Amino acid sequence: MTTPSHSSAPRSLRALLPWVAPVGVVVLWQLASQLGLLPRNLMPAPLAILSAGIDALRHQQLLLHLAVSTGRAAAGTLIGASIGLALGLITGLSRPLQLVLDGPLQMIRAVPALALVPLVILWFGLGEVAKIFIVVITVVFPVYLNTFHGVRSVDPLLVEMARVYDLRGFALYRQVILPGAMPSILVGLRFALGMSWLVIIVAETLGASSGLGYLAANAREFMQMDLLVLTIVLWALLGKAADWLARQLERRLLPWQPAGQRLSVE
């Protein structure tokens, strides 16, 4: 009868551990602000930021900008990950295509996505296409490189065995190559999800009229420090949510892997 209670205690403790550092930082931050160690005009207290968030929610301003940024990041990630996956598969499976495509792709990868912003604005203007395009360019390469590496890392003996059992073409890719490459692909996707939020926020500060980046730029212009710090906190939370989403996807797509061997950190 004592076994369940003993096992449940470590589980509950393990669930609380990830929150220890964030809660500790917030408590120390609030104390430092109340004691005057942090100037409130430069770094508002957590309670002031919370009040600004409630105010923005009441006027439906925050949810609108949050939805716009999420939509842009999701669209760019979906398109970029699809392109990166396709490129990684064809270059990983075909040596001639690797020789043709990998060199140009590596040269483009060496150019920071944000360095392309002036060119992208000339191409697409300041509309939605430009912002999504910057996310696409950022997301393509982590997924491409990890897909390529994953395909090349598949055990050749497994492929030969599958061919002995008359697996060919799409069935071979779906049942052997793609599952074998999936852990590496998910690592690339996890990086890509985080990077998509980095670039979309910067892109939204350039001529946008909506989104969290626009909200932050507007708050900076009017010296609304509580709203500015609120957007930074939201970016951190969105990055954590994207990482959680990648881990859930990993659990779903890699059910055969023990939890301790999964690539995500539990």
Language-model segment annotations:
Residues 4-11, 34-78:
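Periplasmic/extracellular loop-to-transmembrane helix junction in inner-membrane transport proteins
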Residues 75-105:
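Transmembrane-helix boundary motif in ABC transporter permease subunits
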Residues 95, 152, 183-187, 229-266:
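C-terminal transmembrane helix and the adjacent membrane-cytosol boundary/short C-terminal tail
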Residues 121-122, 151, 198-235, 254-264:
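Glycine-rich helix-loop "coupling/hinge" segments at transmembrane-helix boundaries
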Residues 106-142, 149-150:
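Generic hydrophobic transmembrane alpha-helix motif, especially the helices
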Residues 146-191, 212, 216:
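Short cytoplasmic-facing helical segments at TM-TM junctions of multi-pass membrane proteins
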Residues 133, 137, 170-203, 226-229, ...:
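Transmembrane alpha-helices
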Residues 3-33:
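N-terminal signal-anchor/first transmembrane alpha helix
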